[in-house]
């Protein structure tokens, strides 16, 4: 039978067994190498309170701490939440990440178009 993916949908490669992690959405046990991982970096303080904190702070240039959160999803939840998308058989072989869409005043702007306009 033909294989759908060279990696079998995981990143194990000769390890035998990998400890499971729990999906953020449905709490399903997923092998750590198979889980879809995303990292969110946010300020601990919301944008509305940043100015109040900087004015009340004793230190002139105090860098506010950030929250680093690693999110693990099972494959079905990641597809359902559109974190990853189903791709065609030829597109599955493309390993480079897709172009990030940047939003400026409710318009989609690609980095290439922004570079052309700047020059």
From Swiss-Prot:
Zn(2+) binds at residues 28, 74. Keywords: Cytoplasm, Ribonucleoprotein, Ribosomal protein. The keyword Cytoplasm applies. Residues 103-119 have a biased composition (Basic and acidic residues). Its main location: cytoplasm. This is Small ribosomal subunit protein eS26. Residues 90-119 are annotated as: Disordered. Component of the ribosome, a large ribonucleoprotein complex responsible for the synthesis of proteins in the cell. The small ribosomal subunit (SSU) binds messenger RNAs (mRNAs) and translates the encoded message by selecting cognate aminoacyl-transfer RNA (tRNA) molecules. The large subunit (LSU) contains the ribosomal catalytic site termed the peptidyl transferase center (PTC), which catalyzes the formation of peptide bonds, thereby polymerizing the amino acids delivered by tRNAs into a polypeptide chain. It comes from the Eukaryota. It is found in: Cytoplasm. GO terms for cellular component: cytosolic small ribosomal subunit. GO terms for molecular function: mRNA binding; structural constituent of ribosome. Component of the small ribosomal subunit. Mature ribosomes consist of a small (40S) and a large (60S) subunit. The 40S subunit contains about 32 different proteins and 1 molecule of RNA (18S). The 60S subunit contains 45 different proteins and 3 molecules of RNA (25S, 5.8S and 5S). Coiled coil: none annotated.
């Amino acid at each position: 039978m033909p294989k759908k993916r060279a990696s079998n949908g995981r990143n194990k490669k000769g390890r035998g067994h990998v400890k499971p992690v729990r999906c953020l959405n449905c709490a399903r046990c997923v092998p750590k190498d198979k889980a879809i991982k995303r990292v969110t970096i946010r300020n601990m303080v919301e944008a509305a309170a940043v100015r109040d904190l900087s004015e009340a702070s004793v230190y002139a240039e105090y860098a506010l701490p950030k929250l680093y959160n690693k999110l693990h999803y099972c494959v079905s939840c990641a597809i359902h939440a559109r974190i990853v998308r189903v791709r065609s058989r030829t597109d599955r072989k493309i390993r480079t990440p897709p172009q990030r869409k940047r939003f400026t005043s409710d318009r989609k702007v690609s980095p290439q178009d922004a570079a052309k306009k700047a020059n």
